[in-house]
Amino acid sequence: MKEKTIIIVGGGQAAAMAAASLRQQGFTGELHLFSDEQHLPYERPPLSKSMLLEDSPQLQSVLPAHWWQENNVHLHSGVTIKTLGRDTRELVLANGESWHWDQLFIATGAAARPLPLLDALGERCFTLRHAGDAARLREVLQPERSVVIVGAGTIGLELAASATQRRCKVTVIELAATVMGRNAPPPVQRYLLQRHQQAGVRILLNNAIEHVVDGEKVELTLQSGETLQADVVIYGIGISANDQLAREANLDTTNGIVIDEACRTCDPAIFAGGDVAITRLDNGALHRCESWENANNHAQIAAAAMLGLPLPLLPPPWFWSDQYSDNLQFIGDMRGDDWLCRGNPETQKAIWFNLQNGVLIGAVTLNQGREIRSIRKWIQSGKTFDAKQLTDENIALKSL
């Protein structure tokens, strides 16, 4: 019997790791990856950090160039897909070529959620999703330039840190009452706000842009009535899933391709993962997790499901952010207001713990990444703690 053919659509973390996972889990059939980018699939996290700060930055490939040939994975870069061919099982390219598939994994990622008021500025307005975006930003983030960043989420704050380190004058505008409100617990939000302010970043909370005038500098009028002058305007206010191909194929979409716990779409032969995917939970709610690790998890889960293997057990959600000299790692459940702190954040070394009825359900480390392995095990096992154990620095965490 002829082995099935699997096609992967996308050029990022989830797409590359799906190819790797399929081979690692024993798939020996024909395997193709189609991407509209010219590069090998590359790591996205460095785009807001090292790609802006290093003297001679290089894209970091998810897998080395030799891996693709050695593992007999056919890589099609710089191509545009016209249709997925859900009914015919034939992927059609813009150049007219068609490619048969038996199973399909879609990992087309996401674009920056548009902000029409700023998009009208054309090339004077920047977002960050791809390597080309980082290259353009690197050119314009020059010393003494005034930079306005709209959005104080993870990307906005990482860009603020990088621009400040490039000696720009940075202002961040955030509609909410805090920074990183979607991702960080209250004590970490307060720490990051103070950290950026101490670095010279002006952060305007509970505010938004009302009017924009393009001139020698961009003039931005805020809801508060204040007017800002900017050489560079950047925004990051969320994502818009690249789900057009899926919508045209009549897959279930809601700003993302709806998947189940096996990364399967409403078509049993089509799977999706990474930022383009949104999971329908058992209670019917839709949940999206935008992180490097989530892309890897989706790749492993989808590969197992495609091959009819048991699904891997998922670790607690985890992501990291590098801002200035700080490395913050977030693991587990970030909800709740009653967090314990071990150490002193003012020394830039601390761990915040989230206990629920004595059970550790989440944590954030500040320049204490070596503790993440133990914390992950504790969260997975549902380990209980006395609050004094976790906060007493005289008690080594590894002894608990």
From Swiss-Prot:
The keyword Flavoprotein applies. Its EC number is 1.18.1.3. FAD binds at residues 5-36. InterPro entries: FAD-oxidoreductase/Apoptosis, FAD/NAD-bd_sf, FAD/NAD-binding_dom, FAD/NAD-linked_Rdtase_dimer_sf, HcaD, Reductase_C, Ring-hydroxylating_dioxygenase. Its cofactor is FAD. It catalyses: 2 reduced [2Fe-2S]-[ferredoxin] + NAD(+) + H(+) = 2 oxidized [2Fe-2S]-[ferredoxin] + NADH. Coiled coil: none annotated. This dioxygenase system consists of four proteins: the two subunits of the hydroxylase component (HcaE and HcaF), a ferredoxin (HcaC) and a ferredoxin reductase (HcaD). Part of the multicomponent 3-phenylpropionate dioxygenase, that converts 3-phenylpropionic acid (PP) and cinnamic acid (CI) into 3-phenylpropionate-dihydrodiol (PP-dihydrodiol) and cinnamic acid-dihydrodiol (CI-dihydrodiol), respectively. PANTHER family: APOPTOSIS-INDUCING FACTOR 1 (PTHR43557), RIESKE DOMAIN-CONTAINING PROTEIN-RELATED (PTHR43557:SF2). This is 3-phenylpropionate/cinnamic acid dioxygenase ferredoxin--NAD(+) reductase component.
